[in-house]
């Protein structure tokens, strides 16, 4: 323990001034401790006073409204010429201490035997900060110390209380922690117990489950009635971790699925049968020969009298394949065509006949000609003989017929857009047509398909007459 003596003492100044400051040897006369104004108007402050020994004195002075002065209520001491200070001795400090249940020691100059109560001074910002720091230090120290070393813990508490006295606070104001308030456990005398006796909990082997107070909230130990029957208690397996990991992590090769043939059920279904006509159209040989003979005549027909001769357009030329061009005709065919051309010359002589013919031709070309609807004509012996003798010619005529049907449709679409010619133009066209027909067979070899058409219409007119 230190030899310093510490007492709490209350300094006061009567009411009147605005500001009072206490200074002395404790702060090297710097004037750092202001007095607190109470409700009565006077100024007071309670602070710990330290004395180095019994003969030591505590010197102090007041600064009232900025003036250094000495109080008449305290003892005065002349330090040097013209300088006075108030001072306190140990007797002055002991008289002010009032402790209930405490006894004084006469040999020690009236010092208290017990610890004096320490009244806290006025609250200040500096003291509050110090108190907070001290409380934190105290709690941290108490946590670190264990309960086994009781002597060390008691000494630390005494030191902390002394620190509280220095700052002007007491342990009464500070809320005590749980460890401070709880009493220490009394040490038990172990020597009284027998050396071989131990406290053992009773075990009930007949009970299926045992209940025990768990340590730190746990369920406690479990005693199994039949440990020999449980294989986990007896069997021990030695497993190589590497082999187990390799076996588990090994990826098995998955066989790729074989793609089988895809059957399209919806597409391959049988399409519904289309309704067929009861009497299918069958072309006889006689009808075919008749048509084959008439088709070259249709090709040789000149353009209509009342319509101008259409110029060949690139569309018409493209639509007609090369096979539709005039092929060299044998001598037998040329002689037959010349005979047919001579028979039709008499029909186209008069202008009246030509006009009537133009009207009839207009009616014919307004609708597509249908061969089946035309009245069947009796075949002559010459026509039947020609069909039997030249089967190759008939095949060529059929091909030409199919190709020229397309060219006819193109010509009709072009001629329908053009205007109808006047009467003068009709006469000119009739004269040109007559000149072309009277030409020699050699010079008109290139115009055979057009002249054949005139022969076809001429035959039709003869039959109707």
Swiss-Prot record:
| GO biological process, any | signal transduction
Q: Name one Pfam family in it.
A: AMPK1_CBM
Q: Where is the composition biased (Basic residues)?
A: 127-151, 451-465
For this protein, what is any one GO molecular function term? protein kinase binding
Which residues are reported to carry the modification Phosphoserine? 153, 156, 271, 319, 343, 394, 440
- Where composition is biased (Acidic residues), the residues are 156-165
Q: Where is this region: X-DNA-binding?
A: 160-161
Q: Which UniProt keywords apply?
A: DNA-binding, Phosphoprotein
Superkingdom classification of source: Eukaryota
Residues where Phosphothreonine occurs?
A: 182, 295, 366
What residue spans carry the region label Disordered? 107-227, 247-276, 298-465
Identify the InterPro entries for this entry. Answer: AMPK1_CBM, CRP1_MDG1_kinase, Ig-like_fold, Ig_E-set
* One cellular component (GO) term of this entry: nucleotide-activated protein kinase complex
Q: Which SUPFAM superfamilies match?
A: E set domains
Q: Where is the composition biased (Low complexity)?
A: 166-177
Q: Where is the composition biased (Basic and acidic residues)?
A: 337-363, 385-398, 404-428
Q: How is it modified after translation?
A: Cleaved in the vicinity of position 160 to give an X-DNA-binding N-terminal subpeptide and a non-DNA-binding C-terminal subpeptide.
**Function summary:** Cruciform DNA-binding protein which exerts an enhancing effect on the cleavage of cruciform DNA (X-DNA) by endonuclease VII from bacteriophage T4.
Q: Which family does it belong to?
A: Belongs to the CRP1/MDG1 family.
Instruction: Output the PANTHER family linked to this UniProt entry.
Output: 5'-AMP-ACTIVATED PROTEIN KINASE , BETA SUBUNIT, CRUCIFORM DNA-RECOGNIZING PROTEIN 1-RELATED
Q: Protein name, please?
A: Cruciform DNA-recognizing protein 1
Q: Which organism is it from?
A: Saccharomyces cerevisiae (strain Lalvin EC1118 / Prise de mousse) (Baker's yeast)
Biological classification of the source: Eukaryota, Fungi, Dikarya, Ascomycota, Saccharomycotina
């Amino acid at each position: 323990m230190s030899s310093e003596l510490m007492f709490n003492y209350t300094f006061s100044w009567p009411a009147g001034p605005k500001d009072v400051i206490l200074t002395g040897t404790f702060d090297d006369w710097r004037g750092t401790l202001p007095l607190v104004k109470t409700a009565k108007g006077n100024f007071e402050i309670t602070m710990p006073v330290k004395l180095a020994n019994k003969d030591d004195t505590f010197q102090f002075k007041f600064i009232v409204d900025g003036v250094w002065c000495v109080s008449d209520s305290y003892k005065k001491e002349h330090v040097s010429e013209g300088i006075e200070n108030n001072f306190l001795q140990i007797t002055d400090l002991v008289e002010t201490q009032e402790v209930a249940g405490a006894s004084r020691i006469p040999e020690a100059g009236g010092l208290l035997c017990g610890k004096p109560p320490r009244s806290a001074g006025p609250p200040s910002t500096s003291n509050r900060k110090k108190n907070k720091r001290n409380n934190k230090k105290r709690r941290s120290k108490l946590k670190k110390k264990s309960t086994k070393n009781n002597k060390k813990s008691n000494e630390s508490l005494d030191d902390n209380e002394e620190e509280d006295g220095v700052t002007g606070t007491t342990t009464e104001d500070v809320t005590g922690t749980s460890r401070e308030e709880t009493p220490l456990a009394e040490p038990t005398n172990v020597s009284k117990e027998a050396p071989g006796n131990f406290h053992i909990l009773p075990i009930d082997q007949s009970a299926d489950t045992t209940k025990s107070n768990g340590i730190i909230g746990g369920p406690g130990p479990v005693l199994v009635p039949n440990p020999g029957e449980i294989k986990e208690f007896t069997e021990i397996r030695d497993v190589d971790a590497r082999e187990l990991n390799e076996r588990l992590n090994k990826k098995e090769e998955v066989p790729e699925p074989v793609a089988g043939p895809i059957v399209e059920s919806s597409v391959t279904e049988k399409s519904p049968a289309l309704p067929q006509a009861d009497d299918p159209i069958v072309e006889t040989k006689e009808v075919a020969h008749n048509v084959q003979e008439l088709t070259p005549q249709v090709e040789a027909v000149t353009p209509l009298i009342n319509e101008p001769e259409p110029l060949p357009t690139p569309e018409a030329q493209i639509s007609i394949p090369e096979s539709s061009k005039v092929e060299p005709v044998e001598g037998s065919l040329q002689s037959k065509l010349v005979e047919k051309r001579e028979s039709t010359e008499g029909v186209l002589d008069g202008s009246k006949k030509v006009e009537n013919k133009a009207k009839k031709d207009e009616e014919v070309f307004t609708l597509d000609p249908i061969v089946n609807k035309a009245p069947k004509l009796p075949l002559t012996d010459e026509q039947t003989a020609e069909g039997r003798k030249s089967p190759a010619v008939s095949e060529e005529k059929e091909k030409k017929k199919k190709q020229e049907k397309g060219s006819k449709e193109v010509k009709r679409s072009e001629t329908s857009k053009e205007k109808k010619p006047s009467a003068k133009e009709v006469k000119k066209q009739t004269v040109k047509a007559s000149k072309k027909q009277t030409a020699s067979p050699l010079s008109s070899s290139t115009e055979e398909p057009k002249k054949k058409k005139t022969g076809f219409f001429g035959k039709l007119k003869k039959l109707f007459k």
